[in-house]
Amino acid sequence: MLCLSLNSSSTSPPKSPLHHSFSRRSMRSWVCSPRVQRKKLGFWSSPKAVLSAVSGAGSEAGKVEEAEEYDAIVIGSGIGGLVAATQLAVKGARVLVLEKYVIPGGSSGFFQRDGFTFDVGSSVMFGFSDKGNLNLITQALEAVDCKLRTIPDPTTVHFHLPDNLSIRVHREYDMFISELVNYFPHEKEGIRRFYNECWKIFNSLNSLELKSLEEPMYLFGQFFRKPVECLTLAYYLPQNAGDIARKFIKDPQLLSFIDAECFIVSTVKALHTPMINASMVLCDRHFGGINYPVGGVGGIAKALANGLVNKGSKLLYKANVTKILLKDGKAVGVKLSNGREFFAKTVISNATRWDTFGKLLKVEDIPQEEKNFKKIYLKAPSFLSIHMGVKAFVLPPDTDCHHFILEDNWGRLELPYGSIFLSIPTVLDPSLAPEGHHIFHIFTTSSIENWEGLSHKEYEEKKELVADEIITRLEKKLFPGLKDSVVLKEVGTPKTHRRFLARDSGTYGPMPRKVPKGLLGMPFNTTAINGLYCVGDSCFPGQGVIAVAFSGVMCAHRVAADLGIEKKAPVLDAALLRLLGWLRTVA
């Protein structure tokens, strides 16, 4: 039996660019219909799938009773939350996921317009390989008996940078290094030495069984099995990519290129990007590669949600959590905006830390550790996003799927609207658009402060003005005739992202206030409130698909240990958590 379909053609067009809606008829068809052609679907499942993972607005996947106590409640169904939930469900825990919206996925969701299927967030998908231990999306799907069909991307990203610097990051590592050396022959040795450092970290991480770094029995077990790899990671934990790069590279333009590489990873330059984060991305794009799921990125969350239900746990949509309930200082449940309350032994928040500790808890309940977190990290900016349907003639032959554009001034890299990230997923999967058309998905940084205090008319006019400027830049740099090719356009601002993704200020995630000590300051999954855990991009190791999936795996392991499902050592637990807490204070 097919697990899910990724192509629901009867979607009614909602009002906002990030609003996703479904008709009950189309949802029943992708769950139940055995006649849908397999090649039009993104994945397969074992013959267990019976319930829809997307049951419609305000409905439930699995009957949800308020009086029932769960082992874990997960607030939000982003990739981090879904990985944590499914990993716990597979271990036998009874999990309830509460999603504010009407489909799962958050930033990894999708929406449809006039035959176009758009990814809400990034189309650059890591974690789908069939080797190593960092193929975390593959592992998460396999755990719930699902598999997605994917299309390999031969080029991770094509950089278009100042001084006509045009570099393709080829899937084949040697091709990428050769292209980079061709531009910077005098830095040949430095290039290889810097990226070799990245590989040293990646290979160490990729060799380990990935579980919670807050669980001492696992941590010590890995150390005794792989001492060299563990010591390697410990050595690089407090270091940043920019410092390592400067040990080997002197050319300022090449260092600026590495800034651009890291900016894609973390929204900050290399000197502020932890070396471990950079290494995961800069190496996995060549090891496992970028692989796009057939039918769109939204299929990942839909598969995990469906798998969660198949494993006996539950998912409630249109469930807006407004409060985390505490009893004697312990998290015991949540309250929804409609007054419903649900109770569990543990609560896992997939919201940002600003939402979790700024909105879901009373001010007097916020621990000092979370106040310290806000002293080290601030909210990264949000994005202006433009989703467009365009006529196919505008694409030159052999156009790459992903592009990063910074035309004439390295100093504009981090500024609002300074750099542009463009995805054209139809280069890989034409089924996402009507015949003869392509999808353009454009991102550029923007802060919510720039969109506040406007009347509706002023807001709409500003959206059109800023979008037109961005499109004009793309037309001038890469795609002559782009404006005339546009058949559909949806513009999302930081206010859009705040509303539909439930992220404070629409933020991309945490960003260090000053030069960080690598990842030392980044909290793990446990919090100072007993029974409350966090998962997602506000936790170690940070932003990105691999990172939030890793966070989900770690969180599930730690929660399972605390529930008694996994082995634990209470005395060692307390000592390790104190040590990790102390390390964060020196960051």
From Swiss-Prot:
Fetch the Pfam families from UniProt.
Answer: Amino_oxidase
Region annotation (Disordered) maps to 1-21
Compartments where found: Plastid, Chloroplast membrane
Q: Supply the EC number(s).
A: 5.2.1.13
Transit peptide span, please give it. 1-50
Taxonomy, superkingdom? Eukaryota
What's this protein's function? Carotene cis-trans-isomerase that converts 7,9,9'-tri-cis-neurosporene to 9'-cis-neurosporene and 7,9,9',7'-tetra-cis-lycopene (also known as prolycopene) into all-trans-lycopene. Isomerization requires redox-active components, suggesting that isomerization is achieved by a reversible redox reaction acting at specific double bonds. Isomerizes adjacent cis-double bonds at C7 and C9 pairwise into the trans-configuration, but is incapable of isomerizing single cis-double bonds at C9 and C9'.
* PANTHER family referenced in this protein's UniProt entry, alphabetically: PROLYCOPENE ISOMERASE, CHLOROPLASTIC, PTHR46313
Q: What is this protein called?
A: Prolycopene isomerase 1, chloroplastic
Gene expressing this chain: CRTISO1
